[in-house]
C-alpha cells in the first residue's frame, strides 16, 4: 500500500484571491470596529469623567440679604439654602428672624429667585410667616422632583419647646419654580410630633437604584429622638415616612463634650447608588471634624458600622454644604477651622469623598457660618453650558450673621 504524497499543485486561482480578499476585508472591518469602540470610549470618558478639567474659579459674588433691619424690618437673616430647579431656576432661601438673632422667636421664610444663572435676583419675597409665636419656624431643607418639577421646602415649628408643647414638621411646595407656594402642610399625622430638624440644606432625589426616584430629606432630632435620620417619599412627595437612623450616645440623655452626637446634615448620592450623609459633629466626638454616614438602601437604614470620621474636613461644629456633580465630583464647603467659624473654604474630591484635593478655594477668610451648595449643569436655553457651582453662605466682617452672600463658581475655571 502506498501513502498519498503531499500535493505540489498550485492553489486554485479561482478561490485564492477571493479568500484573501475576504479575510483582508474582515481585518479592515475589525480595525474599524476597534477604532469606533475606542472613540466611543473616549467620548464616554470625556462625558463621564471631567476631573482633568476641574479648576474652580469664583466668577461672581453678591450679597442677597443684609441683617440689621434693612430689609422688611428683619433683625437677622440666617440659615441659607440654595437649589437649582429641574428647569434651571435658582432658588435661595433664608430664615428672616424678626426680632433678634436667636434660633427661637418669630420668623419669615425669605426667598429670592434667579432665572439667569445667578446674574440677577428677584426682590425678597416672604413666603411663610409664623406670626409672633415664641418658638417659630426653623429651616430647613429643599428638594426637587425632576419628574414632576415640584419643589418641596421643609421646616420645623416649636423645635425648642420654648413657650409651646408640640413640635411639627411642615411642608410647602411650588409647581412653578418658586413663583407661588402652597399653604403649609403639617406632617404630624404621617410622621408624629417628635422633633425633626430638616437639613439645613438640600434633600436629594435618587438618580440610581436602589429606589431610583425616591425623595430623601435628612435631619436630626433632640433628646426624644436624637441622632440623624431621614424622611422618605416614593410617591413624588404625596406621603412621607421615616427611615431608621443613627442615634447619639448616650441615647435620650443630655450629651457631654466628646459624646457621639451627629447633628445637622447634608446627603448626596454616589455613582454606585449609595447615599452619603455628611453631618455636624456636635460634641467633637473623636475629632474636630465631620461625621460621615453611608446608606446602601436609599436611607431605609443607617447602620453604626457605616459611620466614619473625616479628619481632612476640619470643622468648628457647624452646618456645611455638600453636593455631587453628574460626573461624580464631590464638593464640600464649611468654615475650615477646628474652633472658630472663619475661613469659608470650598474643597472637592474625585474619589467619592474618601480623599480631598490639596487645592482649595477660599471664599472668605473672615467670619463665616452655615453654607449650602447647588449646581447647574447641562443645557441652558438650548446651549450646552460648562457646570456652575453656587455657594450660599453666612458672611460678615465682625460676625458671620451680618449677611448672606452667594458666590458663583465656574467648575472648569472658564468665564
Swiss-Prot record:
Result for mutant: residue 335 to Q: In SIALIDOSIS; type 2; unable to reach the lysosomes
EC numbers on record: 3.2.1.18
pH-dependence annotation: Optimum pH is 4.6.
Effect of residue 270 to P: In SIALIDOSIS
Keyword Hydrolase attached: yes
Catalytic activity entry: Hydrolysis of alpha-(2->3)-, alpha-(2->6)-, alpha-(2->8)- glycosidic linkages of terminal sialic acid residues in oligosaccharides, glycoproteins, glycolipids, colominic acid and synthetic substrates
Active site: 103, 370, 394
Effect of residue 294 to S: In SIALIDOSIS; type 1; mild mutation as residual activity is still measurable
Broad enzyme group: hydrolase
Domain of life where this protein originates: Eukaryota
Short motif (Internalization signal): ranges: 412-415
BNR repeat start-end pairs: 112-123, 172-183, 231-242, 347-358
Family: Belongs to the glycosyl hydrolase 33 family.
Function comment: Catalyzes the removal of sialic acid (N-acetylneuraminic acid) moieties from glycoproteins and glycolipids. To be active, it is strictly dependent on its presence in the multienzyme complex. Appears to have a preference for alpha 2-3 and alpha 2-6 sialyl linkage.
Protein name: Sialidase-1
Species per Swiss-Prot/TrEMBL record: Homo sapiens (Human)
Amino acid at each position: 500500500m502506498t501513502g498519498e504524497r503531499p500535493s505540489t499543485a498550485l492553489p486554485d486561482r479561482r478561490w485564492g484571491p477571493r479568500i484573501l480578499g475576504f479575510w483582508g476585508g474582515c481585518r479592515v472591518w475589525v480595525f474599524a470596529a476597534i477604532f469606533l469602540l475606542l472613540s466611543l470610549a473616549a467620548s464616554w470618558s470625556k462625558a463621564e469623567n471631567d476631573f482633568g478639567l476641574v479648576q474652580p474659579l469664583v466668577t461672581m459674588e453678591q450679597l442677597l440679604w443684609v441683617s440689621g433691619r434693612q430689609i422688611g424690618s428683619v433683625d437677622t437673616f440666617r440659615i441659607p439654602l440654595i437649589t437649582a430647579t429641574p428647569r434651571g431656576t435658582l432658588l435661595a432661601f433664608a430664615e428672616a428672624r424678626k426680632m433678634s438673632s436667636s434660633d427661637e422667636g418669630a420668623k419669615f421664610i425669605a426667598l429670592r429667585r434667579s432665572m439667569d444663572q445667578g446674574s440677577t435676583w428677584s426682590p425678597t419675597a416672604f413666603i411663610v410667616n409664623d406670626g409672633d409665636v415664641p418658638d417659630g419656624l426653623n429651616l430647613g431643607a429643599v428638594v426637587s422632583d425632576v419628574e414632576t418639577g415640584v419643589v418641596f421646602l421643609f421646616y420645623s415649628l416649636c423645635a425648642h419647646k420654648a413657650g409651646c408643647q408640640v413640635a411639627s414638621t411642615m411642608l410647602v411646595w411650588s409647581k412653578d419654580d418658586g413663583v407661588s407656594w402652597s399653604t403649609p402642610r403639617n406632617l404630624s399625622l404621617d410622621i408624629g410630633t417628635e422633633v425633626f430638624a430638616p437639613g439645613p440644606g438640600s434633600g436629594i432625589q435618587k438618580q440610581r437604584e436602589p429606589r431610583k426616584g425616591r425623595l430623601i430629606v435628612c435631619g436630626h432630632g433632640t433628646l426624644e429622638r436624637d441622632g440623624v435620620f431621614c424622611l422618605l417619599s416614593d410617591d413624588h412627595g404625596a406621603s412621607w415616612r421615616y427611615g431608621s437612623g443613627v442615634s447619639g450616645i448616650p441615647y435620650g440623655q443630655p450629651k457631654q463634650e466628646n459624646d457621639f452626637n451627629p447633628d445637622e446634615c447634608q446627603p448626596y448620592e454616589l455613582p454606585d447608588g449609595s447615599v452619603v450623609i455628611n453631618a455636624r459633629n456636635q460634641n467633637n466626638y473623636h475629632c474636630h471634624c465631620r461625621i460621615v454616614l453611608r446608606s446602601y438602601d436609599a436611607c431605609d437604614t443607617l447602620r453604626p458600622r457605616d459611620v466614619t470620621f473625616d479628619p481632612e474636613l476640619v470643622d468648628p461644629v457647624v452646618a456645611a454644604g455638600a453636593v455631587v456633580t453628574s460626573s461624580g465630583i464631590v464638593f464640600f464647603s464649611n468654615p475650615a477651622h477646628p474652633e472658630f467659624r472663619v475661613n469659608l473654604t470650598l474643597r472637592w474630591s474625585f474619589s467619592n469623598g474618601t480623599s480631598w484635593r490639596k487645592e482649595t478655594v477660599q471664599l472668605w477668610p473672615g467670619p463665616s457660618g452655615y453654607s449650602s451648595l447647588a449646581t447647574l449643569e447641562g443645557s441652558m436655553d438650548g446651549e450646552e453650558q460648562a457646570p456652575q457651582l453656587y455657594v450660599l453662605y453666612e458672611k460678615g466682617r465682625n460676625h458671620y450673621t451680618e449677611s448672606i452672600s452667594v458666590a458663583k463658581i465656574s467648575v472648569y475655571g472658564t468665564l
